[in-house]
């Protein structure tokens, strides 16, 4: 093979490789652009039919990362100064964007009567033996409203229906606690992850009650959750301790008992704080711990507001412009 021919072959091979790389790069770029267009279409039209489960999971991941790294500011500015202005805004949208009439009931009474007669009779028939027409109509209306809101919430939270996974998880957790049953590993992982706001509320409430009862940090506010027996026992306990020691020394019962034990000769253990044993080995979880409850509540309210906004837009049935 002559040198010029070898050089030509090498150049052709190099050019072919470059074309393949450009083609691959163009395909990847087109794929990214298409995906972005699908996301934009999803937010504009509430249509999830063109999204695969993997795409929905990626959208959820991006949303969670944004919420975790940039939670909603406590000093969030309201778009409307008053509820009246908000109502006027949606009234204007109804006039400008309102399309065809939307049926009030997405479930026809005949469907409820033929498929779910027991549902209408149990919850809407007021104890009567036979199902009445009014009960069927009311059941159809309530089911329609519930499903329409679930659709809006599903789109706002990027979670396809059925939604009640977290609600079932919360109910299971509460039932297990009340029955003093073994907590399954998956439920323990869900609690430890602190990704489920309602689970966090349950555990935070229990810990707040303990803090308030034994340290008075919340000014006895959580006495409301105690029954009469436990409330009387706690009040009596604090009165007895207050009788034995000055108020300033007995406010924190934990510290007061620890001081008494130390005076009696008990030596502090090496791992005195239980939090030391459970402390994470890295600082990765400190971001979640540093988020205030106000920021968490505002973030949750933002998603609820988005669900309500989409619910209202569903009611408008406006003409979509692409």
Curated annotation (Swiss-Prot):
UniProt-annotated glycosylation sites, renumbered to this chain: 130, 283, 290
Subcellular locations according to the entry: Virion
**Keyword Kinase found:** no
Which Gene Ontology cellular-component terms appear in the entry? virion component
An example Gene Ontology molecular-function term: structural molecule activity
UniProt keyword annotations, A-Z: Glycoprotein, Late protein, Virion
Of which family is this protein a member? Belongs to the baculoviridae gp41 family.
Protein name from the UniProt record: Structural glycoprotein p40
């Amino acid at each position: 093979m002559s040198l010029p021919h070898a050089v030509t072959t090498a150049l052709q091979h190099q050019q072919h490789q470059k074309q393949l790389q450009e083609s691959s790069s163009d395909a990847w770029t087109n794929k990214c652009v298409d995906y972005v267009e699908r996301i934009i279409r999803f937010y504009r039209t509430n249509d999830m039919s063109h999204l695969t489960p993997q795409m929905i999971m990626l959208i959820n991941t991006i949303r969670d990362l944004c919420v975790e790294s940039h939670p909603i500011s406590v000093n969030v500015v309201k778009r409307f100064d008053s509820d009246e202005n908000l109502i006027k805004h949606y009234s204007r949208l109804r006039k400008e964007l309102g399309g065809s009439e939307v049926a009030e009931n997405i479930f026809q009474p005949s469907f409820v009567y033929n498929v779910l007669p027991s549902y209408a009779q149990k919850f809407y028939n007021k104890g009567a033996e036979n199902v009445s027409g009014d009960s069927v109509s009311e059941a159809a209306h309530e089911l329609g409203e519930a499903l329409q809101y679930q659709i809006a919430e599903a789109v706002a939270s990027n979670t396809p229906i059925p939604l009640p996974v977290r609600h079932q998880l919360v109910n299971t957790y509460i039932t297990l606690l009340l029955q003093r049953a073994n907590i399954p590993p998956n439920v323990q992982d869900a609690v430890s992850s602190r990704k489920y706001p309602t689970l966090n509320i349950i555990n935070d409430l229990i810990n707040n009650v303990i803090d308030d009862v034994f340290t008075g940090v919340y000014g006895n506010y959580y006495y409301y959750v105690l029954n009469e027996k436990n409330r009387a026992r706690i009040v009596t306990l604090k009165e007895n301790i207050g009788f034995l020691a000055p108020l300033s020394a007995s406010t924190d019962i934990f510290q007061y008992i620890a001081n008494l034990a130390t005076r009696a000769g008990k030596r502090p253990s090496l791992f005195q704080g239980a939090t030391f044993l459970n402390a994470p080995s890295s600082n990765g979880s400190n971001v979640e711990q540093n988020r205030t409850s106000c920021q968490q509540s505002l973030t949750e309210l933002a998603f609820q507001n988005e669900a309500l906004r989409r619910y209202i837009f569903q009611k408008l049935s406006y003409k979509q412009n692409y």
